[in-house]
Curated annotation (Swiss-Prot):
Binding site for ATP: S346, R458
Pfam families: Gln-synt_C, Gln-synt_C-ter, GSIII_N
Family indicated by similarity: Belongs to the glutamine synthetase family.
Species this chain originates from: Bacteroides fragilis (strain YCH46)
Residues annotated as domain GS beta-grasp: 85-174
Gene name in the database record: glnA
Binding-site list for Mg(2+) 2: E217, E286, E293
Cofactor note: Binds 2 Mg(2+) ions per subunit.
Swiss-Prot/TrEMBL keywords: ATP-binding, Cytoplasm, Ligase, Magnesium, Metal-binding, Nucleotide-binding
Function: Catalyzes the ATP-dependent biosynthesis of glutamine from glutamate and ammonia.
Annotated protein name in UniProt: Glutamine synthetase
Length: 729
């Protein structure tokens, strides 16, 4: 292995940036060239077929089989112009990745001749094996049938020579087995609930859309070094490795000059993204060495999520051409920042109003305040659900590590906006408001745009921060599917808005005027949600203590956090808003707990193998060299000189012996703990056992190995070190 390490470093020194040529000097010449968007539809579809797609997208009108055949034929004709040979239903199973099965257009005609055919039936529905994907026990191996069904709202696209059709994935009995199905339901739920609240202010509003802008963080590592680290290859993170003398402490990497090889990778990635209609806009160095970020312009939430999954696939594929491996793990290296995926979330009406941006008059600001306060209440009531939606084995290393938001959910608004809410509480009473009181209150609300213009600061320690015209959910992990967080947020928001509307309606039925009813319910919600508002340092110990006093939960135990998917409040949201049924929700919990168990199990096995078969032999070999050196010294020096000059070596031999013995014992005990955990039949008990009895060994074993790394001759250490992984360009 040590030879492999030095061969990797030698190979790395010969790397050169690839030459990247853009298809055209004008981005507009090739932007979305590989997407079957409306412009292409108008060209390739009959008018009635084009109208059927538009009606299905905007109104939810079903597409007839006759229209589906016309659409499929037009889609195939367009795809053939790009030399496409295959098609696939592209879907997002519960694996934090995408899935696809490629079929050729080739069929035999009645006379035995080969023809190319793509029918409406093939476009609309296919049958992959549902038992081979995570399904939480919904499908047995002998009950393999599942269905993929076309998502009309997300346009088909071409990658290489394959036509990819975005689809949902459901079981034979109709249960969702993917991320897209519940996401579409959550978006529909928040659309309906938000529209009803909006119509208290403006009857012209008939739809509310959810927008998402994601920020994808990632690490790059040269493939030669990556291949020399079995832990990186098999788990996505380094299970051992002493920190480099220099890491991120000089703060010289963030927004620094991008290395030429990385720039070439980013250029090619952007070209491929733009061909697929993905509006990537920003690229830069992140805080940690060899860490970077890619961010697009925000889009409709469903499409934005599809694009993020597609980008992650593209990054892996393109990185290989540039001799890089992309690391999406939330914490690939100890001691430096991990990677997140900030979700910038907003709601916009079909009349062009951003509901999270102040209006141009008091009425518009009332609408803004109504949605702002409902977000506060939504997060306050559903903090455990939001945490569960982003909790994973990888993300647990990052949350609360003074680099990412803590596991405590709170909202940052900025002091001025918080003061405005406090003023509403002070001015609104339970008695009937006078016209003068209403005017004073509305005038104060009218000043909100002036307040936010210069005083909406950024608090990087807040997990859910208001940033002027959107909320930024910063707790999501870099490897996650955005849909998990977006399902939770939008379903919870729909639930909260429905409750708000019902409360306002009740007061109006009692004879209270609409404006006053809204003010009263807003006041109640501002008071009730006050514990969730926090303007200070989310990393501090003081905040943990203060959060506990406020009654906020702080759950770092992964299985315990995931269990809140099925607590009473989460069920009221996810089942109450018809995002999941009972079976589907139980399935989600089982899948997440099993994923956690398997990831810790793999890490444990990999670390045990590396420790016993790679590190211990090297340590013993070096120890033997030291012992041989002692024997030679004893032959040369006098006994007195020998005792003085050999003391440090004897101490080192003793230290290595202690570390090697400890590693062997810990690996043995970890293996036994794993066996006990594996015999637990209940998936919940197994996950808890892995968290509490297996996972702690990973850090203990690592600690001994990291000490050995600093004590053993660099020439024989088998694995690439942090200084090589992080500082080779």
């Amino acid at each position: 292995m040590s030879k492999m390490r030095f061969f990797a470093l030698q190979e790395l020194s010969n790397r050169k940036p690839l030459e990247i040529t853009t298809p055209s000097n004008k981005l507009s010449d090739y932007y979305a060239s590989h997407v079957f968007d409306r412009k292409k539809m108008q060209e390739y579809l009959p008018k009635e077929a084009y109208k059927a797609v538009v009606d299905a997208t905007e109104k939810g009108t079903p597409i007839s089989r006759e229209m589906a055949d016309l659409i499929a034929n037009g889609m195939k004709s367009w795809a053939k112009s790009l030399n496409v040979t295959h098609y696939t239903h592209w879907f997002q199973p519960l694996t934090d990745g995408t899935a696809e099965k490629h079929d050729g257009f080739i069929e035999f005609g009645e006379d035995g001749e080969v023809i190319e055919r793509f029918s409406g039936k093939l476009l609309i529905q296919q049958e992959p094996d549902a038992s081979s994907f995570p399904n939480g026990g919904i499908r047995n191996t002998f009950e393999a049938r599942g269905y993929t069904a076309w998502d009309v709202s997300s346009p088909a696209f071409v990658v290489d020579t394959t036509l990819c059709i975005p689809t949902i994935f459901i079981s034979y009995t109709g249960e969702a087995l993917d991320y897209k199905t519940p996401l579409l339901k959550a978006l529909a739920a928040v659309d309906k609930a938000a529209t009803e609240v909006c119509q208290l202010f403006d009857k012209n509003i008939t739809r509310v859309f959810t927008n998402l802008g994601w920020e994808q963080e990632y690490f790059l590592v040269d493939t030669s070094l990556y291949n020399a680290r079995p832990d990186l290859r098999l788990t996505g993170r380094t299970l051992m490795g002493h920190s480099s003398a220099k890491d991120q402490q000089l703060e010289d990497h963030y927004f620094g000059s991008i290395p030429p090889r990385v720039t070439a990778f980013m250029k090619e990635l952007e070209i491929e993204c733009h061909k697929l209609g993905i509006p990537v806009k920003t690229r830069h160095n992140e805080v940690a060495p060899n860490q970077f970020e890619l961010a697009p312009i925000f889009e409709n939430c469903n499409l934005a999520n599809d694009h993020n999954q597609l980008v992650m696939d593209l990054m892996k594929r393109i990185a290989r051409k540039h001799h890089f491996a992309v690391l999406f793990h939330e914490k690939p290296y100890n001691g430096v920042n991990g990677s997140g995926k900030h979700n910038n979330w907003s709601l916009c009406t079909d009349t062009g109003i951003n509901l999270f941006a102040p209006g141009k008059n008091p009425k518009g600001n009332m609408l803004f305040l109504t949605f702002l306060v409902n977000v506060l209440m939504m997060v306050h009531k559903n903090q455990d659900l939001l945490r569960a939606s982003i909790m994973s084995a990888g993300n647990s290393h990052r949350l609360g590590a003074n680099e990412a938001p803590p596991a405590i959910l709170s909202i940052f608004l900025g002091s001025q906006l918080s003061a405005t809410l406090d003023e509403i509480v002070r001015q609104v009473t339970n008695s009937k408001m006078t016209p003068e009181e209403k005017t004073t209150l509305k005038l104060g609300i009218g000043r909100i745009p002036e307040i936010l213009l210069d005083t909406t600061d950024r608090n990087r320690t807040s997990p859910f921060a208001f940033t002027g015209n959107r909320f930024e959910f910063r707790a999501a992990g870099s490897s996650a599917n955005c849909a998990a967080a977006m399902i939770a947020i939008n379903a919870a928001m729909a639930n909260q808005l429905n409750e708000f509307k019902a409360s306002v309606d009740k007061l109006m039925e009692e004879g209270i005027g609409k404006d006053e009813a809204i003010f009263r319910i807003l006041k109640e919600n501002i008071i009730a949600s006050e514990p969730i508002r926090f303007e200070g340092d989310g990393y501090s110990e003081e905040w943990k203590q203060e959060a506990a006093r406020r009654g906020l939960t702080n759950i770092c135990h992964v299985p315990e956090a995931l269990m809140h998917y099925t607590d009473n409040q989460s069920r009221a949201v996810l089942i109450g808003e018809r995002i999941f049924n009972e079976t589907e929700l139980a399935c989600r919990l089982e899948v997440e707990l099993e994923k956690y168990t398997m990831k810790v199990q793999i890490e444990s096995r990999v670390l045990g193998d590396l420790a016993i078969n790679h590190i211990v032999p090297i340590a013993v070999s070096y120890q033997n060299r030291l012992l041989e050196n002692l024997c030679r010294m004893k032959e040369i020096f006098s006994e007195e000189e020998y005792e003085v000059m050999s003391a440090d070596r004897k101490e080192l031999i003793k230290e290595i012996s202690h570390r090697v013995s400890a590693i062997k014992v810990l690996v043995r005990d970890m293996t036994e703990a794993r066996k006990v955990a594996n015999h637990k039949e209940n998936f919940k008990e197994k996950a808890f056992a892995y968290e509490e009895t297996v996972r702690p060994y990973l850090e203990s074993i690592r600690d001994h190995i990291d000490h050995l790394e600093m004590e053993i001759d660099d020439e024989i250490w088998p694995l690439p070190k942090y200084r090589e992984l992080l500082f080779t360009k």
